[in-house]
Amino acid sequence: MSLIPYALTRPFLFGMDAEAAHELTMDMLARGQRTPLQWAWSGEQVSDPVQLAGLTFPNRVGMAAGLDKNARCIDALGAMGFGFVEVGTVTPRAQPGNPKPRMFRLPEANALINRLGFNNEGLDAFLHNVRQSNHHARPGMRPMLLGLNIGKNATTPIEDATRDYLLCLEGVYPHADYVTVNISSPNTQNLRALQSDAALDGLLGAIAERRESLARQPEKATGRPRRVPIFVKIAPDLAEEQVAVIASTLQRHGMDGVIATNTTISRDAVQGLRHAEETGGLSGAPVREASNRVIRQLRHALGKDFPIIGVGGILSAEDAVEKIRAGADVVQIYTGLIYRGPALVPQVAKALRAMPRPA
């Protein structure tokens, strides 16, 4: 159980610049994890196992990518009670991202806008941090799953994007429980073009081929080959016809799941609010319905068995239940953690555990 109520720390953090508060929090988590200080934010480990994409998720609540871009805080996040933690997005080479300021709170809407731009320390540093974590062996706790989210460098031309994704896939493959291919951030120029028909077909074809090659190679740790599931993260700003084409392409190339959705470029729900006109991706409550719409469309297009991770606008247990009813199998949170604190994690996990399971 967390020793420090978030209601006491949130005013201090919200009094700071949004990115400065983020960096301070990540530094604190990185320094305190695997020490007695970790109890300050530890949460109840809710057991609600679900089988998905050949994996056993300890519960149905995950940490979305983007919070821990450099995989510095894997164990700290796991201690909050997440059943799975996704870190990244990582790119082959380190890059600074977009100029600051680039993260803005919209508290009236329980929302954030960011245009960070895949700022990260690069693949080598990312893998070093992953190897330092002990997420597979947390004493007295159920092992969480670890997702590693990959992208392309901003300076890589879009026609060469596949090269970056394959470099990252090869690097993260031995360390991931699953890999996420991020083609939907609005903050890397032209990245969302990879969601178009021909571009997506080419990218996923190359990824599928490389994955099959990697899956035949014995792993150093076990001496046995392992097929790592691959998820693809898509945007909320898609027409139903685009969602249907993406769904077909995912299935054709043997992808194991889809994450719906990333942030939105729409400002319809926040017009008139301070910072609403800042460029970047909008997350939090205003993206909830768009995310749910895409999830419903995906479930219709993909059938009942294809894994869907729902993310976008979860600030309460009720929001998470709504995601599952829309068609998601499990959920992820990010902005909700910032506005509600770590207590949200077990609250959501318990609410989802209480839902009737399909027959």
Swiss-Prot record:
Top-level EC class as recorded in UniProt: oxidoreductase
Residues annotated as catalytic: 185 (nucleophile)
Record membrane topology: Peripheral membrane protein
Signal peptide: none
Co-factor binding comment: Binds 1 FMN per subunit.
Binding site for substrate: 69, 114-118, 182, 187, 262-263
One family name in Pfam for this protein: DHO_dh
UniProt xrefs under InterPro entries: Aldolase_TIM, DHO_dehydrogenase, Dihydroorotate_DH_2, Dihydroorotate_DH_cat, Dihydroorotate_DH_CS
Keyword Cell membrane recorded: yes
GO cellular component: a single term: cytoplasm
Binding of FMN, residues: 65-69, 89, 149, 182, 233, 261, 284, 313, 334-335
Sorted UniProt keywords: Cell membrane, Flavoprotein, FMN, Membrane, Oxidoreductase, Pyrimidine biosynthesis
Disulfide bonds: none
Superkingdom of source: Bacteria
Cofactor(s) annotated in UniProt: FMN
Catalytic reactions on record: (S)-dihydroorotate + a quinone = orotate + a quinol
PROSITE patterns: DHODEHASE_1, DHODEHASE_2
NCBIfam families: PRK05286.1-1, PRK05286.1-2, PRK05286.1-4, PRK05286.2-5, pyrD_sub2
Function: Catalyzes the conversion of dihydroorotate to orotate with quinone as electron acceptor.
Family statement: Belongs to the dihydroorotate dehydrogenase family. Type 2 subfamily.
Assembly and interaction partners: Monomer.
Name listed for the protein in its UniProt record: Dihydroorotate dehydrogenase (quinone)
Organism: Paracidovorax citrulli (strain AAC00-1)
Record gene name: pyrD
